[in-house]
Amino acid sequence: MSDNITSASATARFVRVSPMKARRVIDLVRGKTVVEALSILKYAPQAASEPVAKVVASAAANAENNFGLDPRTLVISEAYANEGPTMKRFQPRAQGRAFQIRKRSSHITVVVESQKEGAN
């Protein structure tokens, strides 16, 4: 077992975006380099792209500051959005009825890994 750490992660918890919408954005950047992923997310029209970009940038910063990895060689090896707690609210409807609204939240996790310059 070597002590050579080549990956770092970041997690944003309780993000107020539904997991299904967050996964749609995460699928755009999984397997890409960090620089490429951030440029894709910058111009993605989905609202979930902003919190995902923050997590990607945080994972890259963690890799650089905590483990001394070169940010230009980082690739997103894992990215997923798990379901967080759901807030339940009621929408008043006609004739005294009420419909339930589920305000979903996500836990977004990104793992970046250092790749060799020639590999890809």
From Swiss-Prot:
According to its record, what are the GO cellular component terms? cytosolic large ribosomal subunit
Q: Which UniProt keywords apply?
A: Ribonucleoprotein, Ribosomal protein, RNA-binding, rRNA-binding
* Any GO BP annotation: translation
Q: Relate the protein's function as given in its record.
A: This protein binds specifically to 23S rRNA; its binding is stimulated by other ribosomal proteins, e.g. L4, L17, and L20. It is important during the early stages of 50S assembly. It makes multiple contacts with different domains of the 23S rRNA in the assembled 50S subunit and ribosome. The globular domain of the protein is located near the polypeptide exit tunnel on the outside of the subunit, while an extended beta-hairpin is found that lines the wall of the exit tunnel in the center of the 70S ribosome.
Family affiliation: Belongs to the universal ribosomal protein uL22 family.
InterPro entries (alphabetical): Ribosomal_uL22, Ribosomal_uL22_bac/chlpt-type, Ribosomal_uL22_bac/org-type, Ribosomal_uL22_CS, Ribosomal_uL22_sf
Subunit notes for this chain? Answer: Part of the 50S ribosomal subunit.
Offer one Pfam family short name for this entry: Ribosomal_L22
Q: What is this protein called?
A: Large ribosomal subunit protein uL22
| Molecular function terms from GO | rRNA binding; structural constituent of ribosome
Q: Which HAMAP family match?
A: Ribosomal_uL22_B
Identify the NCBIfam families for this entry: rplV_bact
